[in-house]
Curated annotation (Swiss-Prot):
Keyword Nucleus carried by entry: yes
One CC-aspect GO term: catalytic step 2 spliceosome
Protein name as catalogued: Peptidyl-prolyl cis-trans isomerase-like 2
Gene for this chain: cyp8
Keyword annotations: Isomerase, Nucleus, Rotamase, Transferase, Ubl conjugation pathway
One Pfam family recorded for the sequence: Pro_isomerase
Compartment(s) of residence: Nucleus
Superkingdom to which the source organism belongs: Eukaryota
Disordered: region residues: 227-261, 555-579
Similarity-based family: Belongs to the cyclophilin-type PPIase family. PPIL2 subfamily.
Length: 579
């Protein structure tokens, strides 16, 4: 029987791709999900705020006719200073308060004709008064009647004062898929709203819990009372200055501080532990550990966390056709920027050619072999993609990593000649061409128009990288700043433990006292008993560890063993004597 190949699921790469296809949604699912060209139309009702996406209570509008709720747009303007819908600059003084009439049922109506305003009504507002009317009313009574006065307040206005809030013939203005802050993933919530939503107790309907609600409220009250009581006790002890007999005041204050604050967590502590406590608990061959210690990250691992180093990097690629100045986005692609800077400082890109150049597409280089199949990262292996962030292939001069597939970045990179949206979430963007301090656009234009081999797209003659100069290394600046901060504000802490703390670490949770590593009981012979084998094994492990750091020497292939010659010991031979 044949083997079915029609899977009932799609892989993550297929779902994340721009060319994703779904039987129920058709082609372009990825673009629709990200707000691309084929994104589904989602209409916002006219009585909804364009920022909170909820019915407004204090409506205001911009000069372009976008409606917001005053309580939602003011925090946004204070933080960003832009219009969240189209990204244009916006000030609080630009907002126009809207006066919308209501009928007895609470529906929004035209104040003259009392016609109910719906999603299909052409709605306008007057800039100077803020009164909202149906377009039919203004057109029939004001424009055609040449009566340029507000029908409610009798104030004069001009045609320029008419602002369109909703036009059924132009529904794109209310299309959620085109809103700028939604496409970029910006949150419209304030910090207080975020804290309220993250609080688990706010997501529980206590009225529907019955007796359980009373228990939860009682637990919260008890916990709050205990916290207040503990705080009063600590403040009282600190004010009275209680010390043990024979203990100095300095030692007592140090003991109090260490009890309250605990051991300071190192700046490079990871979120996971070393695992020694779990390993010693499950294996008798491990040295017992009763405390969980956080693993420490190296300086490189610490800096290469996304968003840790936020300073931009700056470099220049000097080619045979001119210089190309680059701005490196360290905050969004730290691994790619680190790899590029380290390879450049190492001289890896010197005299390397651009092996691929396609007009209207991109130019690719960074392979020392010049074939497009070579290249190695600073770690000697591939490193993962970095797609999180707002960076897209949306303009000319985008600098990205070339790869052979998912998580296969090495040393090769390319510079785009135009917007390449189909490469989004497929290639890591880590920089952009800039015209500072010298113009880079002429060099990029010369590269694009340079003659190439039509079969291989290889430039003829070669476009060669003379050198890559690093002007600003953000990682060095970060380390210098950190060292300066440590020299100014940090104090030396004493990591030595008292005898009582050491005894606490040697007592397990079962109450059994555990000997420290290398300790022997009084009267025990160091040469006898089972322990001598354990010591021998530890010595062997130490010797093996020293051998591992010896430099590898290639002595050449081992000689092949000589083939054994079998002596004839009878048998039929080659059957030549047979008749």
């Amino acid at each position: 029987m044949g083997k079915g190949t029609d899977k009932l699921y799609i892989t993550h790469s297929e779902w994340a791709s721009e060319d994703a296809y779904s039987a129920s949604a058709g082609a372009g699912v990825g673009k629709a999900r990200r707000g691309g060209e084929n994104a589904g139309f989602r209409r916002l009702p006219f009585n909804f705020c364009s920022l909170s996406l909820q019915p407004f209570s204090h409506p205001v509008c911009t000069p372009s006719g976008t409606i917001f709720d005053l309580t939602s747009i003011l925090p946004w303007i204070k933080k960003h200073g832009t219009n969240p819908v189209d990204g244009s600059p916006l000030k609080s003084s630009d907002l126009i308060k809207l006066n919308i009439a209501k009928n007895e049922s609470g529906e929004y109506v035209d104040p003259v004709t009392y016609k109910v305003l719906t999603d299909n009504t052409h709605i306008v507002a007057l800039r100077n008064t803020g009164n909202v009317f149906a377009w039919d009313t203004v057109e029939r009574l004001n424009i055609k009647g040449k009566l340029w006065r507000d029908l409610v307040t009798d104030e004069e206005f001009s045609r320029k004062d008419i602002i369109t809030l909703q036009d059924p013939q132009n529904i794109e203005s209310r299309n959620l898929s085109t809103f700028n802050y939604l496409k970029e993933g910006e949150s419209a919530l304030t910090e207080q709203q975020i804290r309220e939503r993250e609080d688990p107790s706010n997501n529980v309907n206590f009225n529907a819990l019955g007796n359980a609600a009373k228990i939860l409220k009682a637990k919260e009250a008890v916990a709050k009372a205990r916290a207040e009581r503990a705080q009063r006790a600590e403040s009282g002890a600190a004010s009275k200055g209680l010390t043990k007999p024979g203990m100095s005041a300095t030692a007592a204050s140090q003991k109090t501080v260490s009890h309250q604050a605990g051991k300071p967590i190192p700046y490079n502590a990871a979120r996971h532990t070393t695992g020694l406590a779990a390993a010693s608990f499950t294996s008798t061959g491990m040295t017992p550990h009763t405390s969980a210690e956080l693993a420490l990250l190296s300086d490189e691992e610490y800096m290469l966390k996304r968003g840790r180093v936020k300073q931009k990097g700056y470099a220049r690629i000097s080619t045979t056709l001119g210089d190309v100045n680059l701005e490196l986005h360290t905050e969004y692609a730290p691994k790619a920027v680190w790899n590029f800077i380290k390879l450049a400082k190492k001289g890896y890109y010197k005299d390397v050619t651009f092996h691929r150049n396609i007009k209207g597409f991109m130019i690719q280089g960074g392979d020392p072999t010049g074939t497009g199949r070579g290249g190695e990262s600073i770690w000697g292996k591939y490193f993962n993609d970095e797609f999180e962030g707002p960076l897209k292939h949306d303009s000319r001069g985008t600098l990205s990593m070339a790869n052979k597939g998912k998580n296969t970045n090495s040393s090769q990179f390319f510079i785009a000649y135009r917007a390449l949206p189909h490469l989004n979430n497929k290639h890591t963007i880590f920089g952009h061409v800039i015209d500072d301090p010298t113009p880079s656009s002429p060099t990029l234009n010369n590269m694009e128009t340079h003659p190439v081999n039509p079969t291989t797209n290889r430039p003829t003659p070669d476009i060669r990288i003379k050198d890559v100069t690093i002007f600003v290394d953000p990682f060095e600046e970060f380390l210098k700043q950190k060292q300066a901060d440590e020299a100014k504000g940090t104090t030396v802490t004493d990591d030595t433990k008292t005898s009582q703390e050491i005894d606490d670490d040697r007592i397990t949770w079962t109450g059994k006292r555990v000997r420290g590593p290398g300790a022997t009981e009084a009267g025990e012979s160091s040469a006898g008993g089972v322990g001598k084998y354990l010591k021998a094994a530890l010595a062997n492990q130490a010797n093996q560890g020293e051998d591992e750091i010896v430099e590898f020497v290639d002595e050449g292939p081992e000689p092949e063993p000589a083939k054994k010659k079998f002596k004839g010991g009878g048998g039929f031979g080659d059957f030549s004597s047979w008749d």
